[in-house]
């Protein structure tokens, strides 16, 4: 039993313009070298581009994209008797959102294009429609979990 107190889970703060936690989570993940103002600029430009492309509420597109990419289950390497098994584990909503944001940003960075705002907006629109690299990554993870379902009892 630990003698230290339990750590309270921090709630994500919301961003100054949209008052949205998901936007703030995106900003914190896109951040490089402590340049937060640049990260905010990239996200806000991407949101404007989404608005121009879809002519709908860009935050609903963002929510839909993250909901579409969020995995329900993932695999974790577990060493049992000298061999390593990929054990499927369920993922909580917070961890799932974090993974989804990471996958969306990774897919956006790999895209060819002019700038990050353009690439991110394209990836978010594609993910909201159900296509794109981030969606493919989620499906691949689910396939891995399904293939290794026999090892689920190793949890």
Curated annotation (Swiss-Prot):
Annotated CDD domains: uS7_Chloroplast (cd14871)
Pfam families (UniProt xref): Ribosomal_S7 (PF00177)
Transmembrane segments: none
GO molecular function annotations of the record: rRNA binding; structural constituent of ribosome
SUPFAM superfamilies tied to this protein: Ribosomal protein S7
BP terms from Gene Ontology: translation
Main location: plastid
Subunit structure: Part of the 30S ribosomal subunit.
Protein name in UniProt: Small ribosomal subunit protein uS7c
């Amino acid at each position: 039993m630990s003698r230290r107190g339990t750590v309270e889970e921090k709630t994500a703060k919301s961003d100054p313009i949209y008052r949205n936690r998901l936007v703030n989570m995106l900003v914190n993940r896109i951040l490089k070298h402590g340049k937060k103002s640049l990260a905010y600029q990239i996200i806000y430009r991407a949101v404007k581009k989404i608005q121009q492309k879809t002519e709908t509420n860009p935050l609903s597109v963002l929510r839909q994209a993250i909901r579409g990419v969020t995995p329900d289950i993932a695999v974790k390497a577990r060493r049992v008797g000298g061999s390593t098994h990929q054990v499927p584990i369920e993922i909580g909503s917070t961890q799932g959102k974090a993974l989804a944001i990471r996958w969306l940003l990774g897919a956006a960075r790999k895209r060819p294009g002019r700038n990050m705002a353009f690439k991110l907006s394209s990836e978010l629109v594609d993910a909201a429609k159900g296509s794109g690299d981030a969606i493919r990554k989620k499906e691949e993870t689910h396939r891995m979990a399904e293939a290794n379902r026999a090892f689920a009892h190793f949890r």
